[in-house]
């Protein structure tokens, strides 16, 4: 009798252990299946549209400051067109698109080629090579946790960027955009320098606004400028 009870208890323990084992395996398999069906997060790469043939036109205000120049605050107004054109291999063997910049002084003038740069989305980086400087204009995903050094591939000083006003509707110069994002490129003001830089992008379009102000000043006074540049699209 005792032997029977002992054997019964032993077999019961084996059954319990086996049941626990099966349960654990089922949980693992369910977890793997659940993870495999998880929807990948949206990266929002359409903010940086590299579709061939796409173009955007801007009206630009550019001010160059130099207290030693004959024109100390040289102000230029012109029109700028950015067009994505045919593909080209870069020095890393990557397929880029030509990023062609056209300019004209007056609205009725013909467009003239000013610069030919290149543009690419490589992994999670949106890059433009301008004046032989490879700059990371955006990084994906577009969210509050993403930040990056735009000049990481250059010898220039670090330019730390992050996103603000994410997926906000906005109207600029009478044009309405359903979803925009601001790329903050830094701002500061001290005794001898003031700068504020940002770009704004619209989904399915690209850059719709640029604000660049970098001035060498005196005694915190942003009107007492010795040198610097302002650029507004």
Question: Which residues make up each language-model segment?
Answer:
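Generic detector of intrinsically disordered, low-complexity segments in short proteins
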Residues: 1-4, 232
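Bacterial N-terminal signal peptides that target proteins for export
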Residues: 3-20
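Residue-level preference for beta-strand/loop junctions
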Residues: 20-21, 193
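C-terminal motif of bacterial Sec signal peptides marking the signal peptidase cleavage site
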Residues: 28-31
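Conserved functional acidic sites
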Residues: 33-233
């Amino acid at each position: 009798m005792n032997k029977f009870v002992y054997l019964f208890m032993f077999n019961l323990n084996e059954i319990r252990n086996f049941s626990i084992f099966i349960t654990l395996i089922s949980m693992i398999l369910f977890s793997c299946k659940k993870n495999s069906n998880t929807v990948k997060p949206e990266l929002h790469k359409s903010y940086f549209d590299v579709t061939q043939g796409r173009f955007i036109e801007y009206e630009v205000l550019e001010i160059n400051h130099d207290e030693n120049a004959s024109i100390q605050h040289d102000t230029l107004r012109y029109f700028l067109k950015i067009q994505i054109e045919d593909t080209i291999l870069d020095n890393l063997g990557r397929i880029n698109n030509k990023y062609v910049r056209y300019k004209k002084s007056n609205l009725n003038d013909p467009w003239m080629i000013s610069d030919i740069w290149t543009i690419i989305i490589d992994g999670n980086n949106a890059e433009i090579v301008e004046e032989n400087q490879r700059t990371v204009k955006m990084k994906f995903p577009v969210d509050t946790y993403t930040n990056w050094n735009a000049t990481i591939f250059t010898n220039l000083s670090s330019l730390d960027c992050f996103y603000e006003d994410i997926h906000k509707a906005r109207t600029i110069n009478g044009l309405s955009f359903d979803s925009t994002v601001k790329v903050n490129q830094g701002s500061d003001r001290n005794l001898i320098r003031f700068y504020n830089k940002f770009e704004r992008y619209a989904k399915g379009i690209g850059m719709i606004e640029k604000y660049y102000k970098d001035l060498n000043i005196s005694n915190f006074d942003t009107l007492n400028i010795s040198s610097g540049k302002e650029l507004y699209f």
